[in-house]
Amino acid sequence: MAITAAQVKELRERTGSGMMECKKALVETGGDIETAIEWMRKQGLAKADKKAGRVAAEGIIVTAVSQDGRKAAMVEVNSETDFVAKNEDFRQFAEDVAHQALISNPATLEDLTSLPLGKGRESVDERRHALVAKIGENLNVRRFTLVEAENGCIGRYVHGDRIGVLVAVEGGEEALAKDLAMHIAASKPQAIAPKDIPVEILDKERAIQIAQAKDSGKPPEIIEKMVQGRLQKFLSEITLLGQPFVKDPDIKVEKLLKDAGANVYRFARFEVGEGIEKKVENFAEEVRSQAQGD
């Protein structure tokens, strides 16, 4: 029978094991989750399996960049505790994974975790599993991204190993690209320009603003103007071009780029543990404070 991605995901969540291990277990057991767990235990995966119930919400963000500075990879690798996130073996593993992503161009996370790491035949996921057994915590290669700048450069910024940004910039100086990466780390834009915001997000915000404006009791034509104004403000807050530049709030990023003769055509921002239920420190505010010299 064909093994689905949903089955692999469920088995990963229940065992904490890697994609390839879970897929193999499901193939061996005809796709039955419970039997697959038992099979994995029989294959000597029990030690790692015992770590599966713990949430790996700490970790680090690591980047790797090509020699010509026009291509970069960024990886988030999670651990259970901040203490392990500072472990040298853990860091080396994360750096090796980022380098492998950079040189191999994997299309998916499953592709990345099945790649060989270093000169040996051990895969990324096999190395991860060995580290779980050695360190004694659940570890997870959570996500990665690749960013290329064919006609420009890559700006990158990592704050305290917990926030990472890659931004592809055409025109301007490398210093500008780095400043933009720092800005994105602090200001968390959702897209470059208003046209890049998904329609469903705009529709949801519009509905919220209409509901709020109706409570004012004003005429429909006034309500429409109020809604449009609030939507414009919303878009300026969540798009890179509309945001005040973090190092000089008197100028917007759009004007900063125009004055420098530069364009941003892609960026990626990772923050450790995004979407994982845990206590979150406000590292974005810390970046903003540092950038503004507070």
From Swiss-Prot:
Q: Where is this region: Involved in Mg(2+) ion dislocation from EF-Tu?
A: 81-84
Keyword vocabulary terms for this entry = Cytoplasm, Elongation factor, Protein biosynthesis
Assign the protein's first listed, main location to one coarse class: cytoplasm
Gene3D superfamilies per the record? 1.10.286.20, DNA helicase RuvA subunit, C-terminal domain (1.10.8.10), Elongation factor Ts, dimerisation domain (3.30.479.20)
Location in the cell reads:
Cytoplasm
Against InterPro entries, the record matches this protein to: EF-Ts_dimer_sf, Transl_elong_EFTs/EF1B, Transl_elong_EFTs/EF1B_dimer, Transl_elong_Ts_CS, UBA-like_sf
- What CDD domains does the entry give? UBA_EF-Ts (cd14275)
This protein's GO CC annotations: cytoplasm
Keyword Cell membrane tagged: no
Q: Which SUPFAM superfamilies match?
A: Elongation factor Ts (EF-Ts), dimerisation domain (SSF54713), UBA-like (SSF46934)
Name any one GO molecular function. translation elongation factor activity
Lineage, top-rank taxon, reads Bacteria
The task this protein performs is described as: Associates with the EF-Tu.GDP complex and induces the exchange of GDP to GTP. It remains bound to the aminoacyl-tRNA.EF-Tu.GTP complex up to the GTP hydrolysis stage on the ribosome.
**Can you tell me which family this protein belongs to?**
Belongs to the EF-Ts family.
Task: List, alphabetically, the PANTHER family matched.
Answer: ELONGATION FACTOR TS, ELONGATION FACTOR TS, MITOCHONDRIAL
User: What's the protein name?
Assistant: Elongation factor Ts
Q: Which species expresses this protein natively? A: Nitrosococcus oceani (strain ATCC 19707 / BCRC 17464 / JCM 30415 / NCIMB 11848 / C-107)
